[in-house]
Amino acid sequence: SISRAFLGEGARVVIGYHRSQDDAQRIVDDYPDRARCAHLDIRDRESIQEFAASSSELFDAAPTTLVNNALVDFSFNGEARPKAADISAEEFRTQLDGSLHAPLAMIQELRPGMAERGFGRIVNIGTNLFQNPVVPYHDYTAAKAALLSLTRTFSHDLGPEGITVNMVSGGLLRETDASSATPAEVFDAIAEGTPLRSVTTPDELADAVLFFASPWARAVTGQNLIVDGGLVKG
């Protein structure tokens, strides 16, 4: 949805895929002039370096917008997640690698091109579980909280180079690969608890990401925009 939102506004997009090559290729087929895809394993720094280099080569220009939205091996099913007594340090390391170390590496690889142009837009994907930890996603939430801190501290470092760094935090989305295991009654309960009586969709989250990359957000950096139908007040 994020890729399609940018393409719908005329942007050129390079999509990183790990296991979902077919999904990425479908988008490329729909926008053959402005979309490309390349393999990316966010757990591997060498893969990140290769992806960053290929992103510049595919359109003969350094990217000026980066969206960090990849997720490593996680299923949004509260009943199946380990509780405090059982969760392991390794599970925390896995999520920190995916949600903190990978965005850090992506930013470091693409920052020089942005700084050279004096313009860059970085959007990290967070979660509303910072404010509303109603399910035991301990490892996921902790890693995303670390990413929020990185968003804020990097906004200070990169601002003088013309680069903004922001975060968009959704709740449970209806529906993504990660939320496909979520029981229907959970979606219903969330919808009932929001002022808008709805569960946020991937398209709605994508529109918020698009805002941070747009001219309307040119004076905004270091911020976390919660997009969850009003369930959590940020």
Task: Give the ranges of each region predicted by the language model.
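A glycine/serine/threonine-rich, flexible loop-to-helix segment
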Residues: 25-27, 80-82, 160, 167-194, ...
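Short C-terminal tail/terminal secondary-structure segment
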Residues: 132, 192, 196, 210, ...
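Alpha-helical segment proximal to the catalytic Tyr-Lys
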Residues: 112, 156-157, 218
